[in-house]
Amino acid sequence: MRQYPGMTRPLATVHTTETDIVTGFLRALERCDIDAALAMVTEDLVYQNVSLPTIRGRRGLDRAFRPMLRPGRMGFAVCVHHVACDGDVVLTDRTDEISVGRFRARFWVYGRFVVRDGQIAVWRDSFDWFDITVGMVRGLAGVLVPVANRQMPS
């Protein structure tokens, strides 16, 4: 990364507690470690997938995720392309993957997290329905012809 006058180190290497909390949360979801993920959110969490119903509270997140996100049922993977932090707000540009058996749907997600007192208080994801539809079609095709399903970015 190019250095500019006044920069003490490249921006790509800047880590904050807030970004570590958010990426740690996403990694816990990848491991299907719901208990670890729940420990990283506030009791009054607001989780919104834009255009879908809002989930409120740690218990609401637990009720939504625990039944489905577990090994042998449904998996989740994430590739964070970019992360930015401004105070208590963390932005992520990422590719998410939802998998069930051989089915794998990958799609772009923009996330906005607000960290309060070391825990995630707001988790708001935005996505493109067309991109999700393409990911689902590729995922279905990939069940029959594995090469039709694109690889997770690295």
Each model region followed by its residue ranges:
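Short, low-complexity N-terminal intrinsically disordered segments enriched in polar/charged residues
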Residues: 1-39, 43, 150-154
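A beta-strand edge to alpha-helix "cap/lid" segment located at domain peripheries
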Residues: 2-10, 69-154
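Hydrophobic alpha-helical core bundles mediating ligand binding, dimerization, or RNAP-core interactions
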Residues: 22, 29, 41, 61, ...
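Charged/polar, solvent-exposed surface patches and flexible loops
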Residues: 24-27, 39, 63, 67, ...
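Short glycine-/acidic-enriched loop or helix-start segments at secondary-structure transitions
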Residues: 15, 57, 132
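A solvent-exposed, acidic/Ser-Thr-rich amphipathic alpha-helical stretch
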Residues: 34-38, 42-88
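A structural signal for well-ordered alpha-helical scaffolds and beta->alpha junctions
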Residues: 18-22, 58-61, 106
